[in-house]
């Protein structure tokens, strides 16, 4: 076996002429049974004519039979873990001669695993202050706020105006129109043009004014345009927050008092922050693990990871309402820009797999079943049907792999040497 470069290897294989002839005769006989030639009964055409008439088909069938068989045999003999599809070249196939060919392929690299426990990483459990708890509860109260109509007066900062809008200029096609839109005057989220032009108006007042929208505005019809609107103030409201009392706590769930609610909120904040801090620490552990191990990675793995990263970016764009086809991107440059990160991610995956093998870390049947049951609840389908679907499309394997990776990361985190943040 010859090492070409990195993980790429090649094999030159020779198949004895006698075996090639035997296989050729078998294929000729098979073709002969099915061939229908003028002047001969089905299956009775002479072999010499069959060989001449179907030379191309016979050659292809012999190659498709012998090459994969002998290649697989040689790969197993040399204990090679091939990734991707081997490239077959330099095929030498002539009568009464050995069949020779060259196979070029990539293999999973041999990794000499160094130290992976006791890795130093900055980490400390997060703190949750009383102010954090109060802020989170205030957010909940904001979500439960009621907007109450109040007597007409000029709009001021902090008021909520109920406005009807219709575009007069600046929009192609049908005008933009809304019968009832609620805006908070003076709020950061409200366009300044609305604040300036609505401030001081009273219910029943009307006004025309222009609003300039940024190029990245969510609505394609308004993005990057200067639009003239006709606005009518239809009402005035104020926001009323619910009182922070035991009754409010009881409405939110299984809490009897405000103190119980505060304790539950404190625990929820701590859990979320702890998860985020641990994820950050785990990422740093993986970075150190990758930096400490130098080995080549299969290009087929890197290309696959680049595709995954690009597809994730495309999905993110679509979710934001952006059509990637209109961005005029050089996709080759986009892909190449992902290469370094993709290569590190492949290395990380291979190293974590090596650690999980060394420590016998695996996903259990119960853990996989729990994820399937969760998916079944979300999809409102029978568990058995979802399990069958996941088994057929390979999702079960991906779930098991994801669980194994999470458990391996937790193993590394638990055995890391944690230091206080500098």
From Swiss-Prot:
Gene3D superfamilies assigned to the protein according to its UniProt record, in alphabetical order: 3.10.50.40, Trigger factor ribosome-binding domain, Trigger factor, C-terminal domain
Cited InterPro entries: PPIase_dom_sf, PPIase_FKBP_dom, Trig_fac, Trigger_fac_C, Trigger_fac_C_sf, Trigger_fac_ribosome-bd_bac, Trigger_fac_ribosome-bd_sf, Trigger_fact/SurA_dom_sf
Keyword Chaperone among UniProt keywords: yes
Cellular component GO terms, alphabetical: cytoplasm
EC number: 5.2.1.8
Coiled-coil annotated residue ranges, if any: none
GO MF: peptidyl-prolyl cis-trans isomerase activity; protein folding chaperone; ribosome binding
Pfam families (UniProt xref): FKBP_C, Trigger_C, Trigger_N
Ranges for domain PPIase FKBP-type: 158-242
Sequence intervals crossing the membrane: none
An individual GO BP term: cell division
Free-text comment about domains: Consists of 3 domains; the N-terminus binds the ribosome, the middle domain has PPIase activity, while the C-terminus has intrinsic chaperone activity on its own.
Protein name: Trigger factor
Species annotation: Solibacter usitatus (strain Ellin6076)
